[in-house]
């Protein structure tokens, strides 16, 4: 069954970079994406990009200008996979769009891309797993790698055979940003970034939410501020907006 995995605002003059679960990158200009209404079904992304039938888009980034050499050589694309692997590559490596896409990261057979973020080289990273734990570390702990590299261990998962990463966030302003997590049954929790002690990458992290049968497993982690409105969308497409 199809469901929404991410959402965001788009500037028609910007370029969207789409990343698939198998680790490929594709490009579209925002104005090339058909505009719809609140209740319309939308267009299948496979009809707009040359994506393999057994692959799917799991993340995207918006970039205004891939020709700005200063920008693309001072920003990075940060990948996180289901199994806790993290990879950091210079944005410049993805600045030459190709119709059939390019390999953005080498993914092992039992893994998939679940989150992609753009960083400035000085962000803090928080990764969360299904079992309600989160790890915080500085992105300098992740060395820059080539476009097709596999990556390094970002978080160690529980050995219960069911644990996996559900999200990764990049913190740009620890003074104003807070952490929001949401569980399968719609329970949410907001907490200060300082509740998550800084550690080295690759650890198991600290508890971010108490997981019970009532709450269900964790499904997402986001950074939010007091000025943000929150929109939570379930698998049926029902949207709830919160202040």
PLM regions and their residue ranges:
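Single conserved hydrophobic/aromatic residue that forms the stacking wall/gate
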Residues: 2-13
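Conserved structured catalytic cores and adjacent interaction surfaces
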Residues: 4, 57, 61-209, 213-242
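Conserved glycine-bearing catalytic or ligand-binding loops at nucleotide- and phosphate-handling centers
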Residues: 14-56, 86, 90-93, 138-153, ...
């Amino acid at each position: 069954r199809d469901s929404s995995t991410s959402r965001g605002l788009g500037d028609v003059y910007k370029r969207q970079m789409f990343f698939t679960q198998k680790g490929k990158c594709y490009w579209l200009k925002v104005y090339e994406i058909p505009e719809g209404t609140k209740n319309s079904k939308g267009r299948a992304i496979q009809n707009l990009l040359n994506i393999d039938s057994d692959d799917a888009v799991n993340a995207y980034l918006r970039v205004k200008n891939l020709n700005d050499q200063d920008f693309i050589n001072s920003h990075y694309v940060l990948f996180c996979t289901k199994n806790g692997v993290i990879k950091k590559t210079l944005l410049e490596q993805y600045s030459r769009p190709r119709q059939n896409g390019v390999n953005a990261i080498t993914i092992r057979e039992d893994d998939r891309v679940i989150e992609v973020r753009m960083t400035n080289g000085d962000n803090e990273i928080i990764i969360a797993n299904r079992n309600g734990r989160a790890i915080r570390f500085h992105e300098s702990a992740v060395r820059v790698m080539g476009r097709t590299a596999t990556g390094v261990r970002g978080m160690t998962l529980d050995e219960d055979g069911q644990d996996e990463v559900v999200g990764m966030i990049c913190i740009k302003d620890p003074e104003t940003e807070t952490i929001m997590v949401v569980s399968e049954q719609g329970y949410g929790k907001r907490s200060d970034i300082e509740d998550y002690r800084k550690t080295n990458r690759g650890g198991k992290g600290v508890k971010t939410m108490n997981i019970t049968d009532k709450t269900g497993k964790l499904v997402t982690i986001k950074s939010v501020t007091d000025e943000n409105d929150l929109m939570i969308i379930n698998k049926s497409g029902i949207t709830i907006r919160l202040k």
